[in-house]
Structure formats: structure tokens, C-alpha cells
Swiss-Prot record:
Stated role: One of the primary rRNA binding proteins. Required for association of the 30S and 50S subunits to form the 70S ribosome, for tRNA binding and peptide bond formation. It has been suggested to have peptidyltransferase activity; this is somewhat controversial. Makes several contacts with the 16S rRNA in the 70S ribosome.
Annotated spans, Disordered: 38-60, 224-257
PROSITE patterns in alphabetical order: RIBOSOMAL_L2
Protein name: Large ribosomal subunit protein uL2
Lineage, highest ranks first: Bacteria, Pseudomonadati, Pseudomonadota, Betaproteobacteria, Burkholderiales
Organism: Burkholderia mallei (strain ATCC 23344)
Gene this protein is translated from: rplB
NCBIfam families reported in the protein's UniProt record: rplB_bact
Length: 275
């Protein structure tokens, strides 16, 4: 994996920085593990915008990822590493001994030809998936389940990981990259090691069109709108917002906490916020 600074042949390429990985597969993805994915442009089933700044972009197939890793005791060989347009991490195509192929999130350090295992008897090695009760305290993990059998939900992005801090009774404590310490049931599964493609955060888009390829539309400032469109809008010429920053619906931004899920608050030992 290398970081390439593009030659400034145009204003759009002058600030562009690419992450090049020559180990990635250059052919087509495995057809049996693809699914169709229609563009929603940020709209829900009523046609109303629920997520702003989305629309357009290149057509993409969804890669069906195995987040559960439930084929216990069956060795799997990494056939190839692939790019996935739907996530920041790369993915790995693994071939199990019984002939089945699946996609998984590619862990850091896993190479083509390496053998992976899942289950309580799997060795503590990068890429292997075990229940948290079988993972030693202090181990770096990723792709962590929040409910047993539901599939990995935490620490799935490029370069992310968590650390297993302690086990007490039916629950373990895991420190996430954000600093939050969370309780997780010991029957939940996690994968050893970190997520690969850790240099993803170093890339520079370079030009607006590169974001349009990804389906990201422009973000208009509130002070550039009319009063009917945003609380910051209106005024003659360029004006300040005239109030603390808020969203288009009047909710304070820049640090205002909006979490309302009291049901799972007991699972958070330490919040990621310092205050």
C-alpha cells in the first residue's frame, strides 16, 4: 500500500492524494455474492428527503458481507483482497474447506493464501473470529457484535479497532476508538486484530467531482439561504447568523447531544465525551 501525490496537471489534481494498493484484485467481484442496489438519493418510501446531500453517483453493486462468521471449525483460505465501493475498508474473498465462498472485512496484515478460522477453538490470530469469552483480556479486536448472533456492528471502518479491557460475569468491557467504554455480552463474537486499509484517512479528494462520483451532493450554508429555508437565512448582503449555530430545524449543533436511547444507556460504562 502506497500514498501517491498526483502531479499538478490541473487545479483538480493539484491537491489530490491517492492510496494505491497493488495487492487488490483487478478483475470483477464474485458474482454470487453481489446484490442490486438502487439509488435512493436520500429519500424514504414517501419520497421525502431524510438524508440531505445525497444523490447521483456511479452505479454500484452491494457486496454481501459475512458479519456473523458462524462457520465454526471449518478452515477458510483467503483467495483475494478486493475494493468495496460501499465502505472504507477493503474486503477479502475467503474459500471454506466445504467449497463455500464468502466476503469478510479484510483485517490488517491478512494476506492472500492465509488460513482463517472461526469458533471458540480458533487460535488467537489476526482475522480469526471467536466469542468474547474466549478472547484474552487486552487483545485488539474489531467487527464486534452488540447482540449474540446479530452480526458485527462496531469497529468495521478502515483502520478502526477496539480493546477488550475486562470480563465480569456475563459481560465484557470494550474500549472503542472514540474513547467510549461499552459493555458487551461475552457470547458476542469479535474478530482479532484491526481493520485494514488504515491509510484511508490520508487520502485527499482533490476536486468536487470526486465526491459527486460517490453520490455526495454539495452542502449549502444556512447563511446563504432565505429565512424560510434556514434559521440563519436572510439579511441584506453578507450577514452573520445572529444566533448560536443550529440545524435547519432549530436543533443546536457543534456539541449538542441528541442521544435519546435510554434503553441501552446501561451498556455504556464511560461516554466518549470528556464532560
Amino acid at each position: 500500500m502506497a500514498i501517491v501525490k498526483v502531479k499538478p496537471t490541473s487545479p483538480g489534481r493539484r491537491a489530490m492524494v491517492k492510496v494505491v494498493n497493488k495487492d487488490l484484485h483487478k478483475g470483477k467481484p464474485h458474482a454470487a455474492l453481489l446484490d442490486t442496489q438502487s439509488s435512493k438519493a436520500g429519500r424514504n418510501n414517501n419520497g421525502r428527503i431524510t438524508t440531505r446531500h445525497q444523490g447521483g453517483g456511479h452505479k454500484q453493486h452491494y457486496r454481501v458481507i459475512d458479519f456473523r462468521r458462524t462457520k465454526d471449525g471449518i478452515p477458510a483460505k483467503v483467495e483475494r483482497l478486493e475494493y468495496d465501493p460501499n465502505r472504507s475498508a477493503n474486503i477479502a474473498l475467503v474459500l471454506y474447506a466445504d467449497g463455500e465462498r464468502r466476503y469478510i472485512i479484510a483485517p490488517k496484515g491478512v494476506t492472500v493464501g492465509q488460513q482463517l478460522m472461526s469458533g471458540s477453538e480458533a487460535p488467537i490470530r489476526a482475522g480469526n473470529t471467536l466469542p468474547i469469552r474466549n478472547i484474552p483480556v487486552g487483545t485488539t479486536i474489531h467487527c464486534i457484535e452488540m447482540l449474540p448472533g446479530k452480526g458485527a456492528q462496531m469497529a468495521r471502518s478502515a483502520g478502526t479497532s477496539a480493546m477488550l479491557l475486562a470480563r465480569e460475569g456475563l459481560y465484557a468491557q470494550v474500549r472503542l476508538r472514540s474513547g467510549e467504554i461499552r459493555r458487551v455480552h461475552i457470547e458476542c463474537r469479535a474478530t482479532i486484530g484491526e481493520v485494514g486499509n488504515e491509510e484511508h484517512s490520508l487520502r485527499q479528494i482533490g476536486k468536487a467531482g470526486a465526491n459527486r462520483w460517490r453520490g455526495i451532493r454539495p452542502t449549502v450554508r444556512g447563511v446563504a439561504m432565505n429565512p424560510i429555508d434556514h434559521p440563519h437565512g436572510g439579511g441584506e448582503g453578507r450577514t452573520a447568523a445572529g444566533r448560536d449555530p443550529v440545524s435547519p430545524w432549530g436543533t443546536p449543533t457543534k456539541g449538542f447531544r441528541t442521544r435519546r436511547n435510554k434503553r441501552t444507556t446501561t451498556m455504556i460504562v464511560q461516554r466518549r465525551h470528556k464532560r
